[in-house]
Amino acid sequence: MKLTFLGTGAAIPTKYRAHPSISLKFDGEIFLFDCGENTQRQIIFTDVSPMKINNIFISHLHGDHILGIPGLMQSIAFQGRTKPLNIYGPKETAKMIENILNVGYHSIDYPINVYEISAKSPEKIISSDNYEVFSFPVVHSVPALAYVFKQVKKPRMDLEKVNKLGIEIGPDLKRLKDGFNIELNGKIITPDDVTVPPKKGICVGYSGDTIPLNEFAEFLKELKCTTLIHEATFDKSMDKNAKETLHSTVSDALNIAKLSGVNTVILTHISARYDEISAYEKDIVEFKAEHPDLHILIAEDLMEYSLKGK
């Protein structure tokens, strides 16, 4: 699994930071979290394939998180896309996409599926054989969502147990792999009899724009998340601004990371007021003095971060 930070800025882009967008590459697919203006151009400088983007997850409908969608949709249409594009977001996402398609002379020949998500309670919005995606309602000035991407690992077959029970390669073994019981020599054998617990999978949380929420930290902990991407629009000295605009500071994000039990936190959504990040680094040094085990990164445009399960 690999994260690519296409844009790490906030409401106003800078020379160094584009509007928010994060690519998550897993098992040959690209999952895009937010799609700010200029996202498709940022992609050019990476190994992210636009044609492999099957799912876009929108945290909320502020312009800095969605204005890259029209251009991206048009470009992949020009490249001959035929498979569906799934777009997830809060209430009014469908209206937003409809408005995009009704403005200008778009030629979109592939299906676009829009899924509006309740901002009232956590939901499992995708469930597949090897991953799950969850939404979590957060608090911002408009309906907003956080997301969690969780790798699903299945129990592994223990060949020593298989051989000891005299199970041969064939239909019986396949049924056990598929999760069904079998009968052998008058004895019922269950999948648990021939497997070992799965290794811990990768789990990544993305806060979107939000105030710090202990409930979100608890949700991440429940899902055993290993990495958190959290907005940090302001440094600690601007706590008042963060509260007024319903954003988070560096310290807020780090405290949520600590409460959630993740190993790594990556700070993003950096305000345009910061030409350099010394104020962020100061807050991080203070936090690390008491919590040295937490791995802390400040995201930069085009930064890549690889994740491996245990």
Swiss-Prot record:
Gene Ontology MF term list: 3'-tRNA processing endoribonuclease activity; zinc ion binding
Xref: InterPro entries: RibonucZ/Hydroxyglut_hydro, RNase_Z/BN, tRNase_Z_dom
Cofactor binding mode and count: Binds 2 Zn(2+) ions.
Residues holding Zn(2+) 2: 64-65, 209, 269
Catalytic activity: Endonucleolytic cleavage of RNA, removing extra 3' nucleotides from tRNA precursor, generating 3' termini of tRNAs. A 3'-hydroxy group is left at the tRNA terminus and a 5'-phosphoryl group is left at the trailer molecule
Cofactor: Zn(2+)
Keyword DNA-binding found: no
Enzyme class: hydrolase
Active site per the UniProt annotation: 64 (proton acceptor)
Entry's family note: Belongs to the RNase Z family.
Subunit (UniProt): Homodimer.
Function: Zinc phosphodiesterase, which displays some tRNA 3'-processing endonuclease activity. Probably involved in tRNA maturation, by removing a 3'-trailer from precursor tRNA.
Name this polypeptide is given: Ribonuclease Z
Organism: Methanococcus maripaludis (strain C7 / ATCC BAA-1331)
Lineage: Archaea, Methanobacteriati, Methanobacteriota, Methanomada group, Methanococci
